[in-house]
Amino acid sequence: MMVLRQRRAAALFLFAFIFLMPVSHAHSREKADIKTLVIVSHPYPERSVLTKGLQEAAESLEGVTVRNLETLYGYDTRRINGDAERKMMRENRRVVFIFPTHWFNITPMMKAWLNETWGSVGPGLWQGKEMFVVSTAAGGSSTYGPDGRIGVSLADVFLPMKASALHAGMTWLPPLVFESASSDRLPSYQHQLIERLKQ
């Protein structure tokens, strides 16, 4: 009888170990596969819905450091600390830029960040790192693409970013761009961003 009880106890312990232990980790944060620096900018933060939502998605992952330029520096481009930002660049293998397309360009603060942080970057200084652009745009097919008003794709708008990445020796990753962006589709945008950051 004692042996039978011991066997039952051992079986229950084994069952609990195999089937219940993983449940205790079910709510742990997902993790980015590569140590990642995310630079976020929006020219009108108080109106930001999509950019804010994408920032929150990035912040949900371990291994990701998020820096919102307007939160850190306001709108004063002279306050950007190039030394501190370069240190952050050196500590991460991938840099992600999240912003709304602003007059077919990046935001003013993001351009100032690049000027201050990369202003003295010579060819190949960020060798081995990756650049990933994430952007939203109000315009859709009537604006972008071969039949659109400007005749180029939204991804083409970011060619200066691609040139900067390649000049610095970085790998240019395919951008994640959302045309005709809508707050109704924010959960989908967040999911897509998280999946890309986990790669």
Predicted regions and their residues:
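Helix-loop-strand module that forms the ligand-binding subsite of alpha/beta enzymes
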Residues: N81-K162
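Short beta-strand segments enriched in small/hydrophobic residues
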Residues: K35-H42, V134-S135
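Glycine-rich phosphate/pyrophosphate-binding loop and the adjoining helix
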Residues: E30-L37, Q55-L61, P160-Q199
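Structural motif
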Residues: G74-D83, D184-Y189
